[in-house]
Amino acid sequence: MTLWINGDWVTGQGALRVKRNPVSGEVLWQGNDADAAQVEQACRAARAAYPRWARLSFGDRQVRVERFAGLLESNKAELTAIIARETGKPRWEAATEVTAMINKIAISIKAYHVRTGEQRSEMPDGAASLRHRPHGVLAVFGPYNFPGHLPNGHIVPALLAGNTIIFKPSELTPWSGEAVMRLWQQAGLPPGVLNLVQGGRETGQALSALEDLDGLLFTGSANTGYQLHRQLSGQPEKILALEMGGNNPLIIDEVADIDAAVHLTIQSAFVTAGQRCTCARRLLLKSGAQGDAFLARLVAVSQRLTPGNWDDEPQPFIGGLISEQAAQQVVTAWQQLEAMGGRTLLAPRLFQAETSLLTPGIIEMTGVAGVPDEEVFGPLLRVWRCDTFDEAIRMANNTRFGLSCGLVSSEREKFDQLLLEARAGIVNWKKPLTGAASTAPFGGIGASGNHRPSAWYAADYCAWPMASLESDSLTLLAMLNPGLDFSDEV
């Protein structure tokens, strides 16, 4: 029984799904998808639970969420192992994911009060008040790269605001989704407040097509996000929050410390085996001898990166991709770029047959026409050389995406220029593109999405503002508008 609907674990009525470790092939989880009727059942449960949950005091909702935080802490080692085994990422990285889940809960609680709490301003004849109200029943679609942390960034603020939820994890990480749901169960959420439906495309389509849905919160690929946007078009009554991918540029203008810049680039491009939406996909490198030296060093250090299993010792920097198919897609993308005229500096290769272990790839595309503006979700970095900083900014903005952008330069003036001209939601200076602060907005523009699903800013789309003018008494004004006559004369 792998679905959680209205406070009960039930067996899915859809197709059988089997999840294997992407490196070892070990069977980790199996269960049946939710069919359309079960998705509808989950929605009815969420709708029935909504009025009572929304009317609870914020403190009562906060108690359940903080209890969940405590359970994350006490079950950290177990959840770390589940996430690592299911995604293929190293143990150290899965541990940081669980830590981020814990830390963002306190920030989400504070954000509710600061961004969506209640405010009152006194007026001469009364007061103006601002309150926030939950949307109702929300669907949350989770991604596979951070199957605990990123859905958590939607679920926690939504629950705190008073919404009820139907959560569909990625079909590639059902075990992590179930493990997190079991902790919510222990936290004492009332039946129907949070429901879990497992499944792939058919389950997702049934969920997003529900009429009695007040909104959908999504983190994942641009292709799926676009499909959801089309599906919900013409329905302005439903909140749609999309956090999608990016074709992110990293500009290397001047390098004082080559090794430091190489480390920043590797952290930007290859951490999580390149499976972060903020990963650098395009390296825009200044032409000249210094750029040549940097590039040679980048290749030399990158070719030493050896992917390994989640529990290898010593721990590897990168593990496997989410699946063998995902690894092969990266290799295919590299082969296509090479066929277009790209110059391979470091060829990505499958480290072991029938696994998702893939070494990083670097390919130079300077002067190659028609390079697709697509996100290759893996450890593949494309390089362009540029002569001026203005040219680098133009190249950086030459994308339909707008998630993250970074600059390595000793000149603050160039960063100030980039801040004015960059089309990206995250713009960093001498910091990896993949770094993020829980108190800062996380998200982008264009094909990268709309709202900002972080602990602090997620509060904005989990509740809507209600404005009120209020007075303790009602008396006739001494001065009336022209044309109004309240005299006693007939």
Swiss-Prot record:
CDD domains: ALDH_SGSD_AstD. Pathway: Amino-acid degradation; L-arginine degradation via AST pathway; L-glutamate and succinate from L-arginine: step 4/5. Gene3D superfamilies: Aldehyde Dehydrogenase, Chain A, domain 1, Aldehyde Dehydrogenase, Chain A, domain 2. GO terms for molecular function: succinylglutamate-semialdehyde dehydrogenase activity. Its EC number is 1.2.1.71. NAD(+) binds at residues 220-225. The active site is at 243, 277. It catalyses: N-succinyl-L-glutamate 5-semialdehyde + NAD(+) + H2O = N-succinyl-L-glutamate + NADH + 2 H(+). The keyword Oxidoreductase applies. It holds the Pfam family Aldedh. The keyword NAD applies. Belongs to the aldehyde dehydrogenase family. AstD subfamily. Catalyzes the NAD-dependent reduction of succinylglutamate semialdehyde into succinylglutamate. This is N-succinylglutamate 5-semialdehyde dehydrogenase.
